Amino acid sequence: MQNKRMITILGPTASGKTAVAAALALRTDGEIISADSRQVYRRMDIGTGKDLADYVVDGQPIPYHLIDIAEPGTKYNLFQYQQDFHEAYDDICSRGKLPILCGGTGLYIEAVLGGYQLSPVPQNQPLRDALAGKSLAELTEMLVELKRCNGSNMHNQTDVDTAQRAIRAIEIETYNLENPTPERQLPPVDSLIVGINIDRDLRREKITRRLKARLDDGMADEIRALIGEGIDPEDLIYYGLEYKFITEYVVGRLSFDEMFRQLEIAIHQFAKRQMTWFRGMERRGYTIHWIDAKLPMEEKVEAICKLMQDA
């Protein structure tokens, strides 16, 4: 597999990174590969913030990949993402287009850029049974110790905001400890990395405004429809953030005000953890060229094009 130049555009939630990637794609004849761990799911549109209108620029639809590729209720994982990414990446390159990786899931981004060596991890039912009933705090403590043994930075607190996710993370770390040899190695991908840097106060303001708008647009009804299809509410809670708190509201565990307050706090915390991950990437040797989110779109695209020329 031949490495080709790729552009990566990353940033926290509400930074406007998708619109930047789409504008850049129009300018450079590119196609976007999503790096969002929840936008892979079909019919989970409002809650995951797909904002598909961003993929139309000046009336031109921008091709995108790895959105709407999995069914709600399933548990898409990092190993699957790596395989799907390389399939999309090779396809885009084979047609002479520019791949533009865009998203806020730092784990997915770093996994494909760095060529993380992963194996598909089977379910370990005896382990799951042994962990059942433990609190999230207890599970997190176990996960931290397993990560220490593995020398792993593959998971952070972003990934274990529910007990179910923590158990799966422990299952993965346990498997990797017992099976250190990967089944398949994927190459690192050479990429210019651009970060959209949004002021903390502006980010918080946009998060709150966007949350209100999405609730007005029917985010709770979207979740009711998924439950109406027969999807277990606990499987929706597994996805975290909007799906965790709004599902708990829909099934009667939280009032609307409790849901809104807790969800707003959780999204702010999530955005902060995203930035912590990106700063960690810089410490791990990745160069991220930060661009001010407040710049006009044309200036942002020009700045990225100049970086591409200088690379």
Regions found by a protein language model. Give the residues of each.
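Phosphate/pyrophosphate-binding catalytic cores of soluble transferases and nucleic-acid-acting enzymes
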Residues: M1-A311
